[in-house]
Amino acid sequence: MKVLYDDDVNTNVLENKTIAVIGYGSQGRGQSLNMHDSGLNVIVGLREGGKSWKKAQEDGLTVKTIEDASKEADIIHILIPDEIQKTVYENQIQQYVEPGNTISFSHGYNIHFNRIRVPEDVNVTMIAPKAPGSKVRQTYQEGFGTPGLIAIEQDATGDAYDIAIEMAKAVGLTRAGVIETTYREETETDLFGEQAVLCGGLTGLIQAGFETLVEAGYKPEMAYFETCHEMKLIVDLIYEKGFGNMWHDVSNTAEFGGLTRRDRVITEESKENMKKILREIQDGTFATEFAVDADTSYPKLLTQRRLEGEKQIEKVGKNLRIACGLQKEE
């Protein structure tokens, strides 16, 4: 695996290009400001008059409607939520895309699942920071950066790679290291990580552990500390130096118990279910399910969101964080 750094970027193809960043959420703001501060010609495309419009102007950026920004740009970097990208692209962007332009994303979802179809005479690239937009901005301002990915789905002009790696450098990604991937690999692994581990598996594991202790008669506050609050301590150890570092830093009791009991929690059946989740991502089942929910005003998502908010662990956690000074009382 080759990791690309600042010294590996030796081209200057963006010098006379205009980059329109569509959206000014977490990634939109972080990437726009970093590219602007790196000397690139950046404009932001937004809905006129919204909160983001004013914020981008206050940040010193040139702001235009999505249509006007797309019309003016050589590179259109789409950073609005996945579920609205297709509609915005079809209604406000695609009529202004010209041969030789570049359409760029930070997640491959809509290209990989063919929800957005770009003409063959247009580049399709990706620059994907592996951090939230606020962290992308913070580390850039500190003189460093965050790791990231680049991918080329369509190279119509012969210099799509140079465009992507230069954008990655301007965002600050090559300061930390960039890996080249594909739209398929980025999309499928990203969705799997979210569903089976980071957002789905981990939260399910924490909640099941909490409920097990409470149902056995232990105080909910103790259950929260032991199954949720301390999770950050363990994750930080793994993040910094890997699993070996974590095992080294915990007690022998914790290490022995963890290594001899974990296979009874995450079983072969768990792994088979992970494989099923991956297949549903690969064959488009998940993308279809999400699109149907989005197109009908999110009945499934809103129900799940409400149920999550009603869980005991949420109420206990909030009260503890406020009591310990970790969260301000609303």
Curated annotation (Swiss-Prot):
Binding site for Mg(2+) 1: 190, 194
Residues covered by the KARI N-terminal Rossmann domain: 1-181
Gene3D superfamilies hit by this protein: 6.10.240.10, NAD(P)-binding Rossmann-like Domain
Stated family: Belongs to the ketol-acid reductoisomerase family.
GO biological process, one term: L-valine biosynthetic process
PANTHER family in the cross-refs: KETOL-ACID REDUCTOISOMERASE, MITOCHONDRIAL (PTHR21371:SF1)
Entry keyword tRNA processing: no
Domain KARI C-terminal knotted: 182-327
Amino acids binding Mg(2+) 2: 190, 226, 230
GO molecular function list: ketol-acid reductoisomerase activity; magnesium ion binding; NADP binding
Active site: 107
InterPro entries given in the database record: 6-PGluconate_DH-like_C_sf, KARI, KARI_C, KARI_N, KARI_prok, NAD(P)-bd_dom_sf
Pfam families from the UniProt entry: KARI_C (PF01450), KARI_N (PF07991)
Name the UniProt record assigns to this protein: Ketol-acid reductoisomerase (NADP(+))
Residues annotated as binding substrate: 251
Organism: Methanosphaera stadtmanae (strain ATCC 43021 / DSM 3091 / JCM 11832 / MCB-3)
UniProtKB keywords: Amino-acid biosynthesis, Branched-chain amino acid biosynthesis, Magnesium, Metal-binding, NADP, Oxidoreductase
